């Protein structure tokens, strides 16, 4: 009888899922796949806007050729497919719909999060 009551209790009162915190773009590094299809939004870790100006970007990105060298925030290696990526991000054209913005830099030492 006790196991029946416990089963009913667990069936109607499922465990709460942990609350997700805000997206932290400063912790993203490694291989990244940039998705452009809005229909795949639910499969993406977050949304990103590619900022044309360095001054307004949240994160400066340096493209690494090898995934092994992309070991710090701001160092990204482009993944050939979403299945091989550590992070999949949806690229949006509207800045207000993005979780954060990025700008590509050509200098490796400039890569990373901006500090205010």
Regions found by a protein language model. Give the residues of each.
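Hydrophobic membrane-targeting alpha-helices
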Residues: 13-17
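Bacterial N-terminal signal peptides
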Residues: 3-12
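Repetitive, compositionally biased segments used for assembly/scaffolding
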Residues: 18-116
